[in-house]
Amino acid sequence: MNAVLMWMRRTWMLGIVFIIIQCLTWFRYQEAYRDWSWTISLVQGATMLGSPFIAGVCAYMVHRQWPRTTRRDLAGTGRSHHLVSDMTWAVIAWGWAAQAVFLVIGCVSCVVHHADSSGLTLPWQLITGPIALGASAWLGTLAACLWDSVMTIPVMVLAVFLALS
């Protein structure tokens, strides 16, 4: 866990970028605070913008921090699988933190404005966004480990975006 926190400290600017991505969807719909299902859908809908970004970030970080020669040299050590997993979990944690912040903001605004909760389907709306964000991060990490090319990053961003749209 300490390695994940170290990577989170090193990549603190990703938290700000994920907050901006959440803001892009949140402030587009002004009436979201009057309906619970709209509010939660907007928070989880930002996954469509965040998932391609997180896949590209993970692919970039693998190429930048752990090039193929370094991964090959450390492959015999006991912690070789932690090389990219700690970094990926840190990126996922920033994405989940941004979703949690906007989920709290949305819930507070819905409570304050006495929003309608008739269309609320909580289990699916709260689970699918974080799972998709995590899956995109691991997909970007896996692609960067398997395909050692600069083209991995734009290909991952485009592929995840097209898969979600």
Give the predicted meaning of each segment.
Residues 57-94:
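Helix-loop-helix units of permease transmembrane domains in multi-pass membrane transporters
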